[in-house]
Amino acid sequence: MYKRQPERGLRSQVTVDPKHLERYRQVCGFRDDGLLPPTYPHILAFPLQMALLTDKRFPFPLLGLVHLENRIDVLRALGGLGPFTVSVAVENLQPHDKGATFSIVTRLEDQLGLLWVGDSKVLCRGVKVPGEIPPKAEQEPLPLEPVDNWKAPADIGRRYARAAGDYNPIHLSAPSAKLFGFPRAIAHGLWNKARSLAALGERLPASGYRVEVRFQKPVLLPASLTLLASAAAADGQFSLRGKDDLPHMAGHWSRLQG
């Protein structure tokens, strides 16, 4: 059960199922290091996020929302199985040249306080809101080198759906994806991010860091993917690319200040 917070979204108490955690690690390529994968709180929060987005008071249709960007802040090491308090809220409504964007902000807390924060920037096409379109922040690109490559099999959308609970039809099969204009099923954006962070491994610290990604071209399944990254450092960049160097996702990591 979740508790309704009219001014702040929804919140709930959650615990980690070890068998489910192991399934997620296997699907996304994370090794068992005794910590939760940095993307796993998204999975803990997904039922609550769906409850918020399907609430009758939510102003935008769920169908057709596009996940543009995702940011996570790992404030402390993600140890233990809970209980945790997870909360979700919709924030930062802004105009966009194709409609409007908003952020699904997710927070995970333990008994010591705030542990993890996620921000998923979502586009709703055709919606008009007042204000000026914010400028896009661009980083000076760093030299990247290949660090790993893997196959994204035709069934990875279904396998990830079973681990994450996200059964969006564009990820499940070619027939269901074609109903939404895709020639084949496409990989979940958060699977692309999770698989990439698993491959980055020790380039990322255990805590006190941020990872931001921008989703680019969809990964049509099956696919062969290559991860490129800058040298190991406190701050760095990475890119997930497919056949003919097609860009699927661009990201960077940085140390949190303070």
Language model regions located:
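Intrinsically disordered, low-complexity segments enriched in polar/charged residues with Gly/Pro
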Residues: 58-64, 80, 92-96, 204-206
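Hot-dog-fold acyl-thioester-processing enzymes
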Residues: 3-69, 129-203
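HotDog/MaoC-like acyl-thioester-processing domains
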Residues: 50, 68-152, 219-221, 226-258
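Short, glycine- and charge-enriched coil/turn segments that flank and shape catalytic ligand pockets
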Residues: 31-34, 110-113, 206
